[in-house]
């Protein structure tokens, strides 16, 4: 079968990203399917493509497939998939994964958690996620203020 060689995964990842940024989800998925050895960058790119096109359930399914393939999500992967969560229970499950990965204090992840909990009106957990950051940046503060402003 024809596939993108594992010798240079950068090419496949770049193509997935390019198609995703152009809004060509099907092309991004086709290239992703050709990548023989999918790393966290490839998985994150295809998950991001689905989220940007509004295919949230599919993005979460891809995230689950990524974990089943024993590819560890990074901070950016978690932050993207948290934006796709449609049920609080899903978000809490992913939050447990984040804690297990010891990424909960990273600003990009904690800010995504603040936003996710805020969308569901769980201000206590949003505040707790914020408090995990040692040095919240302006995006974190803006997100927290927005969450409190919504409720």
What do the predicted segments below correspond to?
Residues 7-8, 12-13, 17, 28, ...:
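Pentatricopeptide repeat
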Residues 3, 15, 22, 33, ...:
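Polar, glycosylation-prone regions of secreted, cell-surface, and some intracellular proteins
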Residues 1, 5-6, 16, 95, ...:
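Acidic, Ser/Thr- and Pro/Gly-rich low-complexity regulatory segments
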């Amino acid at each position: 079968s024809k596939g993108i060689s594992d010798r240079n995964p950068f090419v496949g990842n770049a193509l997935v990203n390019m198609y995703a940024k152009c809004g060509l989800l099907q092309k991004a998925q086709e290239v992703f399917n050709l990548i023989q050895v999918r790393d966290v960058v490839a998985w994150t790119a295809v998950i991001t493509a689905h989220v940007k096109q509004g295919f949230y359930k599919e993005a979460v399914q891809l995230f689950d497939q990524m974990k089943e393939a024993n590819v560890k999500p990074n901070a950016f992967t978690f932050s993207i998939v948290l934006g796709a969560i449609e049920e609080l229970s899903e978000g809490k499950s992913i939050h447990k994964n984040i804690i297990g990965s010891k990424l909960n204090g990273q600003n990009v992840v904690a800010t995504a958690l603040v936003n996710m909990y805020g969308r569901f009106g769980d201000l206590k957990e949003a505040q707790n996620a914020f408090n995990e950051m040692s040095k919240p940046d302006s995006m974190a503060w803006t997100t927290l203020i927005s969450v409190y402003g919504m409720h």
